[in-house]
Amino acid sequence: MAHSRARRRKRASATQLYQTCKASGTCPPDVIPKVEQNTLADKILKWGSLGVFFGGLGIGTGSGTGGRTGYVPVGSTPRPAISTGPTARPPIVVDTVGPTDPSIVSLVEESAIINSGVPDPLPPVHGGFEITTSQSATPAILDVSVTTQNTTSTSIFRNPVFSEPSITQSQPSIESGAHVFISPSTISPHSTEDIPLDTFIVSSSDSNPASSTPVPATVARPRLGLYSRALHQVQVTDPAFLSSPQRLITFDNPTYEGEDISLQFAHNTIHEPPDEAFMDIIRLHRPAITSRRGLVRFSRIGQRGSMYTRSGKHIGGRVHFFKDISPISAAAEEIELHPLVAAAQDHSGLFDIYAEPDPDPVAVNTSGSLSSASTPFAQSSLSSAPWGNTTVPLSLPGDIFIQPGPDITFPTAPTVTPYNPVTPALPTGPVFITASGFYLYPTWYFTRKRRKRVSLFFTDVAA
């Protein structure tokens, strides 16, 4: 059978033993010297301190805090302590009042000695100036002048005709009978001169600016940042990128689906776009037309959705898609212009239009004067019929397609003319035939067509 050893109990401290055993005289031999600081170490310090002075180093059996002032470097003077608290005022000595002291304090009066019948001593008076007085029986004559004063009188008249009924007490009229002096309007009595003043700013119109040197306001254009390191540059060669970029991302079915004008795309499954450069594109921003290195560039910024988190956020890079439209030439190219009037022998640019000639054409004898090359109207038909065929020469560039114009019908002119026929003399030089029976408006030369306007910027998602 194993014997269990008794647990050792902890001994009480020396201070606790000293408090209980000092009176009974049963203290252990090491308790009293330790508490009363009478050990061998304490005795050595006491004997050594008689011949050696250590100052305020705080060497002793206590804690090593360096005394009240603390430890300082050897050979240095400690700084004086500056108290930051409020300064205490000296106490006022107050006499204490005991319970047996009387509560009534008698007034102390000084004793005064009154001598009855004895005059008060006067201070000595030194001699001063002598004053001589004389008496005269002649009365004094005073010069009194009469002064004139202007008296101001005030009279108050109450007239109920001019008083308003809503006012209980109207202001009475005051008339003054005093003299009123009016000073001249000018300070100097000399003659004055009128000096005209010049007007510097007449108006604030464009012809007369409000400032001396008007500076036009400059508006800073926002920087697009299409060529930063955060964007992947991709050049697109398909021309559909300009008009319908959605065809490069998804396949459209015009039979069952209408035209998709939205530029946001949702891909539920893995798919392959028509163009591999537009893989995982979920958004295309609005287009921007810029010029870079001598080229006109059409740009769009796309957002890829390569990865989705559980919260629904997508993670993907941004791509800058661009396509160069046309180069910008450094110098202007020379364009050859065609003549406006065609030659007489060139009949490729002639158009026939119906016009009403003069009712009574002038008869001209052209037996030997007119030739096929004399005038550009050699191929025109000159007749006296009410309707004639007039040929107008026109010259068009080579890249414009010639289309026949409409027939223009004019109202029939009266057959009676106010002009009498005149028989001219034989011509001696070239003959020019001019007609004055109609006026051909320039817009009737060509057929007016409607142009279909195409917007440069397409519907886009706000960036």
Curated annotation (Swiss-Prot):
One Pfam match: Late_protein_L2
Function field: Minor protein of the capsid that localizes along the inner surface of the virion, within the central cavities beneath the L1 pentamers. Plays a role in capsid stabilization through interaction with the major capsid protein L1. Once the virion enters the host cell, L2 escorts the genomic DNA into the nucleus by promoting escape from the endosomal compartments and traffic through the host Golgi network.
InterPro entries, per database record: Late_L2
Subcellular localization, as worded in the UniProt entry: Virion; Host nucleus; Host early endosome; Host Golgi apparatus
Principal location class: virion
Protein name according to UniProt: Minor capsid protein L2
GO BP annotations listed: microtubule-dependent intracellular transport of viral material towards nucleus; symbiont entry into host cell; viral penetration into host nucleus
Keywords: Capsid protein, Cytoplasmic inwards viral transport, Disulfide bond, DNA-binding, Host endosome, Host Golgi apparatus, Host nucleus, Host-virus interaction, Late protein, Microtubular inwards viral transport, Phosphoprotein, Viral penetration into host nucleus, Virion, Virus entry into host cell
Short sequence motif Nuclear localization signal: positions: 1-12, 446-454
Annotated HAMAP family: PPV_L2 (MF_04003)
Family: Belongs to the papillomaviridae L2 protein family.
Domain of life: Viruses
Molecular function terms, GO-annotated: DNA binding; structural molecule activity
Keyword Ribosomal protein included in the entry's annotation: no
Complexes and interactors: Interacts with major capsid protein L1. Interacts with E2; this interaction inhibits E2 transcriptional activity but not the DNA replication function E2. Interacts with host GADD45GIP1. Interacts with host HSPA8; this interaction is required for L2 nuclear translocation. Interacts with host importins KPNB2 and KPNB3. Forms a complex with importin alpha2-beta1 heterodimers via interaction with the importin alpha2 adapter. Interacts with host DYNLT1; this interaction is essential for virus intracellular transport during entry.
GO cellular component labels: host cell; host cell endosome; host cell Golgi apparatus; host cell nucleus; viral capsid
Key word Secreted present: no
Disulfide links within the chain: C21-C27
